[in-house]
Amino acid sequence: MKKHISLVLLILFLSASSLFAQEGFHLLTTMSGDSIGDQFSVVSHIGDINADGFDDVIVGAPGGDYAKLFFGGAVFDTIPDLIFKDYKQLNCYFGCAITGDGDINGDGYPDIIIGASDTWIGPSFPFEIMTTGAAYVYFGGPMIDTTADLTLIVGDWLTQTGWYYEFGSSVAIPGDLNGDGYDDFVIGAANDDYDAHGRVYIYYGGPNVDDQYDVLLEGEDVFDNFGFSLSAVGDMNNDGFDDVLIGAPMFHNNIPNKIYQGGKAYLVYGGNEINLTNSIEFTGDTSSYQYGRFISGLGDVNGDSINDLGIMGGEYFKIISGYDFYPVLTVYADTNKFGSYYNIAAANDINNDVYNDIFVGMQEAINNEAFNSIFVYYGGVTIDSIPDLEITQEANSFFQSAGFLGNINNDDYIDYILGAQDWYGGVTPGASRVNIYFFGLPDDVQEDINSIYLSNFILYQNYPNPFNSTTIIKYSIPKQEQVTLKIYDQLGRLVTTLVDVEKNVGQHQVEFHTDKLASGVYFYQLIAGNIILTNKLILLK
């Protein structure tokens, strides 16, 4: 049975003043996209892909058509171990959706699925079917590589099917839907053909899993966008089959002229036969819009031993009890501030009180700028509408996704990854970034950090990154050592030496400031004794 739920949400930075003031999230590291427009911010919980005992991290960058996999370790670094791409096609939006933490071929290792919703198929331009989409399956294990084990495409040039499907725009591994002992996987094509009623394709896992879908579910009406969102939820009705939650945010609720889309979500039950007849429907309020755009299986948030659901519309969200499918909480945004909600995700049990918790993203418009926050609602027997934590963001930074990582460095703290897109002037996407946090009390956190400092050489990701003129580079050494820290360009030419002196045990930092260098990628290298560590930094002017 699935224990971990794929998460979809958006986040960026915690302010430095709140980072260590109380029990809360503490920044472990920051990672950024390679270039402006990469949208490096799509994340998902994937588990221990390479079976080395550490949970791993994956981040998609659909604007740059890549996804980076970072193996966990006692010292987590920000140099990717594998980079996934579709090397045959550019601008295919590879990395727009990612899922993992399910073993679809039964080899004992969790697998990864990556969507590329804008993939074209056909002989060559202009004889191609536009944005039919694709999804790629990579089997986990110690020998995982960047060659897809399965390539999934449902469009066909000869029959001229697949126009505008955007297959792969949503992906999920919801568990064992048909009860055969293997995890199954689900791919959405919400914009299918010309009418956008939406489709969801279900593939049954197994030792001989292939690229042919086993079940096709379709939206009820035109423009429903059925399959826009997908989420694993576990076995909601305790019948031995896992289930799946599907969003149709443009469902029109019988509103005249179909102008205002109330939206809908479907809890589709697994079983020997899977169809929409055997499902529970959650219909949005006719006074609002796009209910089901963001959905999440939340785990058990109220302590009744039954998994619960989160379903969000543009101006409100509901926490749905898995016991009777009635809302246990409904919260509306402040429309006077042009407020709207922008994602919901499971957070597992952040504060260790045995109740699962909830991430909620919200944005408001203030003085012609968009501001984002992430709210944390602690689970409990009763849950009220007042968030327990609020994390505010920089202007024009928009939450993209969030994930429960597990423990990527075995430091006794659960880690979380939170990604966001930067938008310049509200219209141009930036390189974007993700932060990895762990949660705890300041004294406990500092004690654990000190123990890490005293046992490892560590070169941290510079902050901020990308940067304009000035950035901070931190490093720690476990013994007194002669240290050099140098900056190089992409050709390996020395730019400057920041440190060349003997340093004592502990954490150190240095400021790198430049007004003369051109925008681009540079490298900083730490040498301490026979230890050499290198990281990348990005200068944007």
Residues of each region from the PLM?
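Conserved beta-strand/short-helix segments
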Residues: F20-D443
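Bacterial N-terminal signal peptides
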Residues: V8-S17
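Positively charged, lysine/arginine-rich intrinsically disordered segments
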Residues: V445-I449
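Bacterial N-terminal signal peptides that target proteins for export
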Residues: M1-V8
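Residues in and immediately flanking transmembrane alpha helices
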Residues: S15-A16, P256, P478
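C-terminal outer-membrane/trafficking sorting elements
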Residues: N450-Y463, F467-K541
